[in-house]
A protein has these predicted regions:
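Structural beta-alpha unit
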Residues: 1-18, 90-130, 137
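Acidic, proline/glycine-rich short linear motifs
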Residues: 3-8, 55-83
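Small/aliphatic-rich secondary-structure junction motif
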Residues: 13-67, 71
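Short, well-ordered secondary-structure micro-motifs
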Residues: 36-37, 63-66, 111-114, 141-143
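Short, structured coil segments at secondary-structure junctions
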Residues: 47, 95, 146, 153-155
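General small-molecule cofactor/ligand-binding pocket signal
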Residues: 52-54, 100-104, 159
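Glycine-rich, Arg-bearing micro-motifs that act as flexible, cationic patches
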Residues: 129-153
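Short, flexible loop segments at boundaries between secondary-structure elements
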Residues: 156-162
Length: 162
């Protein structure tokens, strides 16, 4: 699991057109995630790079679970991962883009940041950009959302799709 650190997000509109992009997109199959994946395909169109589709499995209190319960949760995550991978493949299928599907576990914002930082480290000279959809849930206005957490702590350019 990754820790969130404070930093200032960069402006994605200032990325030169000849830069290879590594677009990290959080994906859970929700309408905001689908919009974010569509936006990522638009951002990558006509450029070199890839879309890194990230499903973050979040278990709030692993310490309170028995070993048997953890095995069941892992099976559920495997099923969800396969379902989301299939949905992403259908959405990205014949667009001629390079994309990869990854599953991570932990805090969603922290894991998206860690994925972006790690992917850029693996591809020196490329630019990592996180693309996420914004949530319209009323509870997120009070408690915060993934997009808000990313906006506060993201060390790479960030695109929040309405």
């Amino acid at each position: 699991m990754s820790e969130i650190t404070n930093s200032q997000p960069q402006d994605a509109s200032t990325i030169p057109n000849d830069t290879n992009l590594r677009l990290v997109t959080g994906y859970d199959g929700s309408p905001p995630a689908i919009r974010a994946l569509d936006a990522a395909t638009s951002l990558l169109r006509g450029r070199h790079g890839s879309i890194e589709v990230i499903y973050v499995a979040h278990v709030p209190s692993v310490d309170m679970m028995s070993a048997d319960a953890l095995v069941e949760v892992e099976k559920d995550f495997d099923e969800i991962e396969e379902e989301l991978r299939t949905e992403a493949a259908a959405q990205l299928g014949n667009r001629g883009l390079t994309w990869h599907f990854h599953r991570r576990q932990g805090n969603i914002a922290a894991e998206l940041i860690a994925a972006a930082v790690g992917i850029v480290a693996d591809h020196p000279g490329d630019t990592g950009v996180i693309v996420v959809g914004s949530s319209s849930h009323a509870s997120h206005r009070v408690l915060g959302s993934v997009a808000v957490g990313l906006a506060r702590h993201c060390p790479v350019p960030l695109v929040i799709v309405p």
